[in-house]
Curated annotation (Swiss-Prot):
Name listed for the protein in its UniProt record: Tumor necrosis factor receptor superfamily member 1A
Region (N-SMase activation domain (NSD)) residue spans: 340-360
Organism per entry: Bos taurus
Gene: TNFRSF1A
GO biological process, any: inflammatory response
Signal peptide annotation: 1-29
Swiss-Prot/TrEMBL keywords: Apoptosis, Cell membrane, Disulfide bond, Glycoprotein, Golgi apparatus, Membrane, Receptor, Repeat, Signal, Transmembrane, Transmembrane helix
Protein's job: Receptor for TNFSF2/TNF-alpha and homotrimeric TNFSF1/lymphotoxin-alpha. The adapter molecule FADD recruits caspase-8 to the activated receptor. The resulting death-inducing signaling complex (DISC) performs caspase-8 proteolytic activation which initiates the subsequent cascade of caspases (aspartate-specific cysteine proteases) mediating apoptosis.
Glycoprotein among keywords: yes
TNFR-Cys repeats: 43-82, 83-125, 126-166, 167-195
Cysteine disulfide links: C44-C58, C59-C72, C62-C81, C84-C99, C102-C117, C105-C125, C127-C143, C146-C158, C149-C166, C168-C179, C182-C194, C185-C190
One GO term describing the cellular component: receptor complex
Domain comment in the entry: Both the cytoplasmic membrane-proximal region and the C-terminal region containing the death domain are involved in the interaction with TRPC4AP.
Sequence intervals crossing the membrane: 211-233
Pfam families: Death (PF00531), TNFR_c6 (PF00020)
Length: 471
């Protein structure tokens, strides 16, 4: 028969045997042996331990950095201790049978090695600068960056085991260690931390202002546009290009320039032509011959096949046709218009018919001068690239040139004709001669063009001979 089973006595007998099998000899110094539980009140002083085979013997413990190799052989004898091998350590006095393995810092937790492992100290791991430790359990931790408190100020700086504590600005609330905008508040907890939102300007704006403001802007723009138009029509320096479009007038007269000759109301359509008796003529040096082939500038219609269009609001450009022209000749009052001396203020006086007949060219030449074909011959004889130079030399201003170009649009030939006609109207009658045009063309080295104009006029008279009036 076996031993009687007594529940109260079985556990103390079985437990030491189980513990002896579970705990190996290498960890006997770390985990107390079951027999030590009964011998805690051992007479061994501090720094010594009971001999495992003889409880009456007290052996000295090994210093840190060493481990127990053999127990002391007897009382008063030294314990055999050995130094820990590399990669192992013991940090306290002990009677361990082997040293403990050194720990390693964990890179996945962003740990860094503060100090390496030595025989009497384990590896010391920590965090980098501006990081703190977030622990789980007693020893495990990971490193996290300290909060910089954006949208707030630092209340308590970052420490080894604690993140920065921030104080948020107005309009932000603290969530964890970050200041979050109150616009992102979606629960009642953050509503307690966020102040009441002030009403925006749009909510408090008067509804009448929304309607009145656009009206004020539109009225201001209209007023500015009207003032610009008035200034453009009033001041001379803005007139040249805008005067004829905005103000409805096409003729500009500058101060100091002769006024354009415009027929008075009720003027008889039949024109009385009066010529100066003393046209000016002076010898002119002839420059070298320069070819002036008009074919390079495009085909131009024959002067005799076209007539000048009426000038826009500027009065008649040319005299009437030869059939309606009355010359200053003696005759009965019912058939002709006699030229009589004008008032003293008049600058152009008609000469007696007998004296004019003695000094003026023949009637065909006069009619040719008064015919629009004469001006068209000059227009067709001068290259378009040199035309503005010609009218500038004749005394036409830049504003007048630009205005006539603007009025005639893309009709270059009609614009040139209008420039020449404007020069005729502004020039005294005794000076507006073909001889003057000839001198200007010679100064421009366009002698070939001058010959072409003479040929176009039929060769009845040379431009260098007796002056021929363009009136």
């Amino acid at each position: 028969m076996g031993l009687p089973t007594v529940p109260g006595l079985l556990l103390p007998l079985v437990l030491p045997a189980l513990l002896a099998d579970v705990y190996p000899a290498g960890v006997q110094g770390l985990v107390p042996h079951p027999g030590d539980l009964e011998k805690r009140e051992s007479p061994c002083p501090q720094g010594k331990y009971n001999h495992p085979q003889n409880s009456t013997i007290c052996c000295t413990k090994c210093h840190k950095g060493t481990y127990l190799y053999n127990d002391c052989p007897g009382p008063g004898r030294d314990t055999d201790c050995r130094v820990c091998a590399p990669g192992t350590y013991t940090a306290l006095e002990n009677h361990l049978r082997r040293c403990l393995s050194c720990s390693r810092c964990r890179d996945e937790m962003f740990q860094v090695e503060i100090s390496p492992c030595v025989v009497d100290r384990d590896t010391v791991c920590g965090c980098r600068k501006n990081q703190y430790r977030e622990y789980w359990g007693e020893t495990g931790f990971r490193c996290l960056n300290c909060s910089l408190c954006p949208n707030g100020t630092v209340n308590i700086p970052c420490q080894e085991r604690q993140d920065t504590i921030c104080h948020c600005h107005m309009g932000f609330f603290l969530k964890g260690a970050k200041c979050i905008s109150c616009h992102d508040c979606k629960n009642k907890e953050c509503e307690k931390l966020c102040p009441t939102r002030p009403s925006t300007g749009k909510d408090s704006q008067d509804p009448g202002t929304t309607v009145l403001l656009p009206l004020v802007i539109v009225f201001g723009l209209c007023l500015a546009s009207f003032a610009s138009v008035v200034l453009a029509c009033r001041y001379q320096r803005w007139k040249p290009k805008l005067y004829s479009i905005i103000c409805g007038q096409s003729t500009l007269v500058k101060e100091g320039e002769p006024e354009l000759l415009v027929p008075a109301p009720g003027f008889n359509p039949t024109t009385t032509i009066c010529f100066s008796s003393t046209p000016s003529s002076s010898p002119v040096s002839i420059p070298p011959y320069i070819s002036c082939d008009r074919s390079n500038f495009g085909a131009v219609a024959s002067p005799s096949s076209e007539t000048a269009p009426p000038h826009l609001k500027a009065g008649p450009i040319l005299p009437g046709p030869p059939a309606s022209t009355h010359l200053c000749t003696p005759g009965p009052p019912a058939s002709t218009h006699l030229c009589t001396p004008g008032p003293p203020a008049s600058t152009h006086l008609c000469t007696p018919v007998q004296k004019w007949e003695a000094s003026a060219p023949s009637a065909p030449d006069q009619l040719a001068d008064a015919d629009p074909a004469t001006l068209y011959a000059v227009v067709d004889g001068v290259p378009p690239s040199r035309w503005k130079e010609l009218v500038r030399r004749l005394g036409l201003s830049e504003h007048e040139i630009e205005r006539l170009e603007l009025e005639n649009g893309r009709h270059l030939r009609e614009a040139q004709y209008s420039m020449l006609a404007a020069w005729r109207r502004r020039t005294p009658r005794r000076e507006a001669t073909l001889e003057l045009l000839g001198r200007v063309l010679r100064d421009m080295d366009l002698l070939g063009c001058l010959e072409n104009i003479e040929e176009a006029l039929g060769g009845a008279a040379r431009l260098a001979s007796e002056p021929r009036l363009l009136w």
